[in-house]
Structures are given as structure tokens and as C-alpha cells.
């Protein structure tokens, strides 16, 4: 009898432990698979593609790749002597037409004062027309001078904001064309996280919700806030043919891949360029408040760590 009781007790204890383990594993699995999280997240930043507004030979490059620069710091300089001469020529034209306009103004004024008693109306009108033509040429010369001055100013390429120079691919002696990208500037203090959440998890994602960001290869957990959720993504299953008719791709009803929607997350603290734009991270949306990690069970902590590996 005692042996039977002992066997039943062992069986009951084993059964209870198995049930508890199953419940714990099930809860961890649900937390792991259904909570709003994704490993498909990337650090992003505001990037300015810097291109000159003038063409010419690059005479000086004042920075090196990956350098932190300040706003208005000189990055490189384009052939200034050519644009200085263009400005001098434009200023000479302005000076010439100013003198000519003064002469024609005096001539027209003299004829207007004498009137038709001394000369014909045609001669008076001709003097006034010549004055208007010269004034028009003067205005055109002044506009050309202003453009030449602007071009000269833009031979010096400056940083539009504080940030890091990256992908610098220009060197002194090269010819650069107008509008061609010379360097990219990653703006300082503009980093954020772009998380691509599955549509099945968007119910738990709202602007203002808190988020945890774990950079790939790091045990450090950053904090952030959901800034916005994209209003739409491209429908790859539907296109238009040459006549504008809709073309719908065939689909298997029992296989449905969840679409991923971009979610922008604002970081609580900027980390400089410790995690460059484009690097990956794991994002967990914790809801309206931050998660208290100290209260997590072993299985919850295990599930949280498993997110790093898939």
C-alpha cells in the first residue's frame, strides 16, 4: 500500500511539474511570438547629400572621411579665380551701364525741358526710349553681377549642419560638375530607429508607446518612444498593365505572409555615431510604460534574449 501511495505521489508530482513547465513554456512562447517586437529594425539618421551649385576644378579639400564637422565649416573649395574674374567682368559691365545711363538720363531730361519748340516730338521720344533701353541693360548687368557674386560664394562648400562627413569621394585636382553629389553628411543628434513591424502586431503599437532597442551584438538596452506609424506600404501583389488594368498576382489562401510596416521610434538619448545609420537592432514595444525587467521570470528573460537570435 505504501509503495502504491509513493508511486502515485511521484507520478502526481511529476505530472504537476510537467504541467507547470508546459504553462511556463507556453507563456514564454506566446510572449516571444505574439508580443509587438521585431529584429528587423535599423538605426537611421537625417542624411544630407552635399552637391556643389557650381562646376569647376576642386582646389582644396579641407576634411577627411568620417570627420565630425561643425555647421558652416568649409568642406572643400572649387576653382575660385575663374569665378572671381567672372565677377570682375560683371562689375565692369555694371559700372559701364551706370555711366551710360547717367548720360542718357541727362540727355533725355534736357530734351524734355526744351520741348517741341526746339525739336520734334520724335527726337524727344527717341531720347526717352534710349534711356529706358539703357536702364534695362543696367538692370540686366546688375542681375548678372549678383549671380556672379553668388556663384563665387558657392565655390566654398560648407557644412549645412553639425554632423559626420561620410563617403567622401572628391579630391583636389578633380573636376566636379554642378549638382553631382560629392559627400554625404550625417546630421548630429538626428538618429532614430526605423522598426519594421508585422501587421499582426500593430494592435499593440501606438504613437507614444514606449520601446526597448537592443543593438545587434550589444547587451545594452536603449529606451525610446514610438513617434509614428507609416500610413501605408507598397502593394506588391497589384500592378497596372499598359492599358491601366489592374494585375493581381496569384495567391495561396492558406499561406499568408504578414506585411511589415515601418514604425519610427524616437530615442530618449542620442548616442552620437556609436551605432551608425543602417546598423540593425531588436525592438520591443512595451506599451504605455517601460517594462520592469527586475520582475521578469526566468522564462521571460530567456524569451527576451532569444529575440536576439530569431
From Swiss-Prot:
The gene is aaeA. Keywords: Cell inner membrane, Cell membrane, Membrane, Transmembrane, Transmembrane helix, Transport. This is p-hydroxybenzoic acid efflux pump subunit AaeA. It comes from Salmonella arizonae (strain ATCC BAA-731 / CDC346-86 / RSK2980). The keyword Repeat does not apply. Its main location: membrane. The chain crosses the membrane at residues 12-32. It is a single-pass membrane protein. The keyword Transmembrane helix applies. Pfam families: CusB_dom_1, HlyD_D23. GO terms for molecular function: transmembrane transporter activity. Disulfide bonds: none annotated. InterPro entries: CusB-like_dom_1, CusB_D23, MFP_Efflux_Pump, PHBA_efflux_pump_AaeA, RND_pump_MFP. It is found in: Cell inner membrane. Forms an efflux pump with AaeB. Coiled coil: none annotated. Belongs to the membrane fusion protein (MFP) (TC 8.A.1) family. GO terms for cellular component: plasma membrane.
Amino acid at each position: 500500500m505504501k509503495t502504491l501511495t509513493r508511486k502515485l505521489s511521484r507520478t502526481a508530482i511529476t505530472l504537476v511539474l510537467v504541467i507547470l513547465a508546459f504553462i511556463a513554456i507556453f507563456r514564454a512562447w506566446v510572449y516571444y511570438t505574439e508580443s509587438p517586437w521585431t529584429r528587423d529594425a535599423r538605426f537611421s539618421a537625417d542624411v544630407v547629400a552635399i552637391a556643389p551649385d557650381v562646376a569647376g576644378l576642386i582646389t582644396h579639400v579641407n576634411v577627411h572621411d568620417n570627420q565630425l564637422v561643425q555647421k558652416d565649416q568649409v568642406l572643400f573649395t572649387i576653382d575660385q579665380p575663374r569665378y572671381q574674374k567672372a565677377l570682375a567682368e560683371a562689375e565692369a559691365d555694371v559700372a559701364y551701364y551706370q555711366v551710360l545711363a547717367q548720360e542718357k538720363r541727362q540727355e533725355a531730361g534736357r530734351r524734355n525741358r526744351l520741348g517741341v519748340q526746339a525739336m520734334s516730338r520724335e527726337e524727344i521720344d527717341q531720347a526717352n526710349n534710349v534711356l529706358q533701353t539703357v536702364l534695362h541693360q543696367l538692370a540686366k548687368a546688375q542681375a548678372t553681377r549678383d549671380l556672379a557674386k553668388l556663384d563665387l560664394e558657392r565655390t566654398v562648400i560648407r557644412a549645412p549642419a553639425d554632423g559626420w562627413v561620410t563617403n567622401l569621394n572628391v579630391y583636389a585636382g578633380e573636376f566636379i560638375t554642378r549638382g553631382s553629389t560629392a559627400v554625404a553628411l550625417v546630421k548630429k543628434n538626428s538618429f532614430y530607429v526605423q522598426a519594421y513591424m508585422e501587421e499582426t502586431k500593430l494592435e499593440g503599437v501606438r504613437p507614444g508607446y514606449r520601446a526597448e532597442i537592443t543593438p545587434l551584438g550589444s547587451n545594452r538596452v536603449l529606451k525610446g518612444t514610438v513617434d509614428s506609424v507609416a500610413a501605408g506600404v507598397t502593394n506588391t501583389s497589384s500592378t497596372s498593365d499598359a492599358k491601366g488594368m489592374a494585375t493581381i498576382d496569384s495567391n495561396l489562401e492558406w499561406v499568408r505572409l504578414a506585411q511589415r510596416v515601418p514604425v519610427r521610434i524616437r530615442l530618449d538619448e542620442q548616442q552620437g555615431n556609436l551605432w551608425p545609420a543602417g546598423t540593425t537592432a531588436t525592438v520591443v514595444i512595451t506599451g504605455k510604460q517601460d517594462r520592469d525587467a527586475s520582475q521578469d521570470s526566468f522564462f521571460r528573460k530567456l524569451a527576451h534574449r532569444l529575440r536576439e537570435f530569431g
